[in-house]
């Protein structure tokens, strides 16, 4: 009776033109052409494939019953082949593939209703023509036992069936439907509790195998059922047992029960769906990183990751659309009381929460990620950072805050500035406190105002050249003393780098500064056009442009770096400006040297050169080559000078010569003259650069000959005896040989161009001409062999005509081998020693 009711839905098919073949003596015999239909008997649950002759419809060419365990094969697109229960091989060749499709659908429908043991298999040839691929379209499916009374035998059979059913998509889909539409997981978990209570160890191991196999099905619906409230703890408990470690048992449930009270709500979460999504995300994370870490294959791992990403996207969208972030930021905006320990702890938890949200957002699609970051900045992220860097002393919390900054600027370095512009242009800009950040670095007098920040370290004082006023302004103020968010961020990071005691936090701040100060991150491919950018610089300087809502990125970049050199650089490089580096941490000095090198190479020379030369930065870098510093710092200083030389700028070259900044470099070479080490290679690499560029300048005499001619001539005249000792590389001897050619070229250029800068110390109308005059006069006096001991201070903070001989540099570290000149000898005596040793 059941079969009768099932048969009602099976309808006959439309006639389709076919050829009927019978296999006789291993040859297919054509028995005729006709029209095939799939039909069911009215009174009995029987189905047939019926073919009638196309010329004589009353003549039946074929009537084959669908019964037993017949396997029908669909070969290619138009052929159905099978062997009936009498052993006769039959084939139907359809005129069109649509006819074949209709009969295949009929076979599938019959199989699902009353002839469950028949099957339909698709057979396709491989692309290489070798062999074939079989795929089950429909057929009998063996499913695991769902009997409430499970035992070792039924569990073993269920495991075998589950593994076999992964081989074909049809069997896999049928098994998935069985799992989802029955209480199979509930049956397994119930038996797990019984087996654990009765110590049925084999049953426990089989249950663990079965659950792991379900994960390998890679079906999202099954995965979500495994982690729902009804099944998750049972599933995790089953996975505590592992056949790889049969004598051991994990403690996943104990871990979860211990973690459960630690889920804290900094701000009450009223959305129950949101709460469930967060719980599911955590459960998947725990499975992926703890429970199944040794078991998951790539497909299962990717499935869990994709589901987690979906949940995380939902979480981030819900957070930014509701009032949750506003309520969270209000903790830092309206509560300045630092004596309330509970409030301080809530603020710390809030930073942990925000950092976790930011790290989660790193996995989102770029549009979703950008929207979330903009929402954070608009709603007051800088108020949170203000607490983290100016109030909080816990280094772990400060590191998390730095992580947030780095994640945002690494994604979009202009995002903070662009959001700041949107806020400034909004009707509420006057009352927005987001850009009014206390960096704790500068007060109105240029001194530090953060006595207790950064773990009690002394802060940095800005020099008088800073000219920056206090970043603290009354709410609603639009005075020039206010720092925009991007400059406030630079000041915060500078403060961390200079004063914090955590090495990890310093390194994070350093990397963030590198990202923020690299113009390529701002401009992308547009930055490649240097000539265009330089013209923009000049136009900007002449017209005093101010940033507008429609300001293109190029002018935003100019405005940004101009503010950096006016407000941040004097603070960041204060120790280099003052020259007071004694007693400072060499690792900090090393990072500062790398930042100077970044400014020289990546920033437009019209901005960076003025700041570096006017503040005597290179003089301090020269001090860092002294033996009292670690070798890494000394070599970094040499590389910085090498980078300046490679820039091929006349101002830089003249400054290096006039301030004798090659003296400490050659002192370092003297210390390591006969050592095959990094110090020796680093200095010689500098000479190699000079020699190579000098050779190029011979070919392009009208372009840039002067700079390297002058530099080569200076080095050979001042350090010739030392260069002659470096006879194990070819380019030092080339420098000496080319100095003769260079001297002739310099004389020729001087004859053509006339005498330049005949006076020294005079005030020029333009500051740059004043600076250059000082350098040229110094160089001129050195060329004449004059050595004035009482010189006036140059505009850079150094002596104008300070010509120190190589012998004046003290050496306090490495001695030299026998035959090496002792440190402290004048050049003339050094030359005598060289001739004696030879």
Swiss-Prot record:
Q: Which InterPro entries match?
A: EVH1_PP4R3 (IPR055236), P4R3-like_central_dom (IPR006887), PH-like_dom_sf (IPR011993), PP4R3-like (IPR051137)
Locations of Polar residues compositional bias? Answer: 747-761
Residue span of region Disordered: 452-482, 745-838
Alphabetized GO MF terms: protein phosphatase activator activity
Q: Where is the composition biased (Acidic residues)?
A: 783-792
* Pfam families, per the entry: EVH1_PP4R3, PP4R3
What is the first-listed, main subcellular location in coarse terms?
Answer: nucleus
> What keywords were assigned to this record?
Nucleus
Q: Which cysteines are joined by disulfide bonds?
A: none
Q: Name one GO cellular component term.
A: nucleoplasm
Biological processes annotated in GO: DNA damage response; meiotic recombination checkpoint signaling; negative regulation of DNA damage checkpoint; negative regulation of glucose mediated signaling pathway; positive regulation of double-strand break repair via nonhomologous end joining; regulation of double-strand break repair
What job does this protein perform? Core regulatory subunit of the histone H2A phosphatase complex, which dephosphorylates H2AS128ph (gamma-H2A) that has been displaced from sites of DNA lesions in the double-stranded DNA break repair process. Dephosphorylation is necessary for efficient recovery from the DNA damage checkpoint.
Protein name as it appears in the record: Serine/threonine-protein phosphatase 4 regulatory subunit 3
